[in-house]
């Protein structure tokens, strides 16, 4: 028997419905903020992620599904969504056109890491990217949008925000951090020692308790911001407060990817483990230029769909009823109900039963399929040109003339 690969799962039945519900909810809200769909390939040149995510990152160093294809091209399955959207933005020459472009995306990402709760080797993300808007109001807007989505799902979260500064204040802070860590570096984990050489600020991203204790009194980037970055961060906090969004300033919050600057944020929840991240993002004004495009400010976020699914499953959310179940009590009426069902499918989701069963058995099947409406034909209904109708939500039932059926529904 052939099974799905480790860390990869099928989306069937209730999982498929939940995935669809999450994506459609996100789409509805992001469209209200002016975002349009951007679909990019699941496979890209490996160099795209080496340049965007950074060769020093764990993603590039350890986790990518990378291979040489039959044409000799170095390719990989995408480990995250932002780089592909940026590549598409540049390839379409939108970076030179000016103006603001807003996109949302969703789909599979791939990382070879240890499978665990809410973390798979093939996982799904929903994300947004805004290009061409440098205002801190846009930073606030993407945070407010994500907060609205998580509220819609009924998930209790804590918003953490930080500023990573810009190309002026970051080098000074990096040197202060290196000086602080230098005498402790031999006590750090192997990953932190590697990061200290390649990208020191990511040492703060370490989740190991031993390293967190050693770095407890490390200098904070928020204490080393220049006037512009400090002013924008204060303005961001003010906008969020005025719009009723609570937050915590976390000076140690650094996004796991190397291209962020200024605003960084993360929504964490205890509903999937102690303060586990369910979504996060920030500003990355340097990435378009870094990937060969015209310098363009950009901000966005990504949300782990599996993590949202895990939380919503715990809430035992009721399945919403949808569609019509149509059936017959005798085989000789199946042709007639098939004809009716086929016609109804032009406007409705319709499940046609090809078997003759008792009314109770049909009702049980309709209930299991979460049908909203139940239509059934027996001898009396057939004689009178009618069909028995029952609404499985409000339990109303009646006989309806077949000629009037669509109008009655």
Swiss-Prot record:
| Any one GO cellular component localisation term in the record | cytoplasm
SUPFAM superfamilies documented for this protein: Class II aaRS ABD-related, Class II aaRS and biotin synthetases
Quaternary structure and partners? Homodimer.
Q: Which NCBIfam families match?
A: hisS
> What EC numbers are recorded for this enzyme?
6.1.1.21
**Stored InterPro entries:** aa-tRNA-synth_II (IPR006195), aa-tRNA-synth_II/BPL/LPL (IPR045864), Anticodon-bd (IPR004154), Anticodon-bd_dom_sf (IPR036621), His-tRNA-ligase (IPR015807), HisRS-like_core (IPR041715), HisRS/HisZ (IPR004516)
Instruction: Describe the family membership recorded for this protein in Swiss-Prot or TrEMBL.
Output: Belongs to the class-II aminoacyl-tRNA synthetase family.
Note the Pfam families from the entry. HGTP_anticodon, tRNA-synt_His
Q: Which UniProt key words apply to this protein?
A: Aminoacyl-tRNA synthetase, ATP-binding, Cytoplasm, Ligase, Nucleotide-binding, Protein biosynthesis
Keyword Protein biosynthesis in annotation: yes
Which reaction(s) does the protein catalyse, per the Swiss-Prot or TrEMBL entry? Answer: tRNA(His) + L-histidine + ATP = L-histidyl-tRNA(His) + AMP + diphosphate + H(+)
Can you say where in the cell this protein is located? Cytoplasm
**Protein name, as recorded:** Histidine--tRNA ligase
Record CDD domains: HisRS-like_core
Query: Which BP terms in the Gene Ontology apply to this protein?
Result: histidyl-tRNA aminoacylation
- What PANTHER family does the entry give? HISTIDINE--TRNA LIGASE, MITOCHONDRIAL-RELATED, HISTIDYL-TRNA SYNTHETASE
- Entry superkingdom: Bacteria
């Amino acid at each position: 028997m052939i099974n799905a690969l480790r860390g990869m799962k099928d989306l069937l039945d209730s999982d498929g419905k939940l995935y669809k519900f999450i994506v459609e909810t996100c789409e509805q809200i992001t469209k209200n903020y002016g975002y349009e769909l951007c679909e990019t390939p699941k496979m890209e040149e490996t160099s795209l992620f080496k340049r965007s995510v950074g060769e020093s990152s764990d993603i590039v160093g350890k986790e990518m599904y990378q291979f040489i294809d039959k044409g000799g091209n170095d390719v990989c399955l995408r480990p995250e969504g932002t780089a592909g959207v940026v590549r598409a933005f540049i390839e379409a020459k939108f970076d030179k056109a000016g103006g603001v472009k807003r996109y949302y995306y969703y789909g599979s990402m791939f990382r070879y890491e240890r499978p665990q709760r809410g973390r798979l080797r093939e996982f799904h993300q929903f994300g947004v990217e805004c290009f061409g808007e440098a205002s801190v109001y846009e930073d606030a807007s993407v945070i407010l949008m994500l907060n609205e989505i998580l509220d819609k799902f009924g998930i209790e979260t804590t918003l953490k925000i930080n500023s990573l500064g810009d190309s002026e204040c970051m080098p000074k802070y990096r040197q202060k951090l290196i000086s602080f860590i230098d005498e402790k570096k031999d006590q750090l984990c192997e990953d932190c020692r590697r990061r200290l050489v390649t990208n020191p600020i990511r040492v703060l991203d370490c989740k190991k308790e031993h390293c967190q204790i050693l770095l407890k009194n490390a200098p904070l980037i928020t204490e080393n911001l220049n006037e512009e970055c400090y002013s924008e961060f204060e303005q961001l906090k003010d906008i969020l407060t005025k719009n009723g969004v609570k937050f915590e300033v976390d000076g140690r919050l650094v996004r796991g990817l190397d291209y962020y600057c200024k605003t960084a944020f993360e929504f964490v929840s205890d509903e999937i483990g102690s303060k586990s991240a369910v979504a996060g993002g920030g500003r990355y004004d340097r990435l378009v230029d870094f990937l060969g495009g015209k310098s363009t400010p950009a901000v966005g976020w990504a949300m782990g769909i599996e993590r949202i699914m895990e939380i919503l499953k715990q809430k035992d959310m009721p399945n919403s009823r949808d569609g019509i179940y149509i059936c017959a009590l005798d085989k000789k009426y199946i042709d007639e109900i098939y004809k009716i069902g086929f016609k109804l499918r032009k406007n409705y989701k319709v499940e046609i039963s090809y078997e003759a069963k008792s009314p109770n058995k049909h009702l049980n099947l309709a209930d299991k399929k979460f049908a909203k409406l139940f239509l059934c034909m027996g001898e009396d209904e057939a004689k009178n040109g009618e069909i028995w109708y029952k609404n499985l939500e409000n339990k109303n039932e009646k006989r309806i003339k077949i000629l009037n059926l669509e109008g009655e529904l």
